[in-house]
Amino acid sequence: MALKPLGDRIIVRFEETEEKTASGFVLAGASHETTKTAEVLAVGEGTRTLTGELIAPSVAVGDKVLVENGTGISVKDGEDYVSIIREADILAVLA
């Protein structure tokens, strides 16, 4: 990966979800989900308090996380598209 997130930013790859009709047709852009599942690819060093103390991120590379739909900025990394989000945008870590 050519990207290294800074501060509390996290690089994720959203899992592709597709809806199909009963006959098997894929409905493009038909997702009505309010959340998405993503895999954490890289994690920044964390945030700093006003006194300069470093607060480490609560997620690690490889974690599966739940993120609100529409969160983050999509960027190209090589041939793939990934998203850069803030740790505060993560709703939950999936077990």
Curated annotation (Swiss-Prot):
The places in or outside the cell where this protein is found are: Cytoplasm
* Matching SMART domains: Cpn10
Give the gene that encodes this protein. Answer: groES
Organism of origin is: Streptococcus thermophilus (strain ATCC BAA-491 / LMD-9)
What does this chain do?
Together with the chaperonin GroEL, plays an essential role in assisting protein folding. The GroEL-GroES system forms a nano-cage that allows encapsulation of the non-native substrate proteins and provides a physical environment optimized to promote and accelerate protein folding. GroES binds to the apical surface of the GroEL ring, thereby capping the opening of the GroEL channel.
Q: What is the lineage of its organism?
A: Bacteria, Bacillati, Bacillota, Bacilli, Lactobacillales
List the protein's name: Co-chaperonin GroES
Its domain of life reads Bacteria
**Family of this protein:** Belongs to the GroES chaperonin family.
Which Gene Ontology molecular-function terms are recorded? ATP binding; metal ion binding; protein folding chaperone; protein-folding chaperone binding; unfolded protein binding
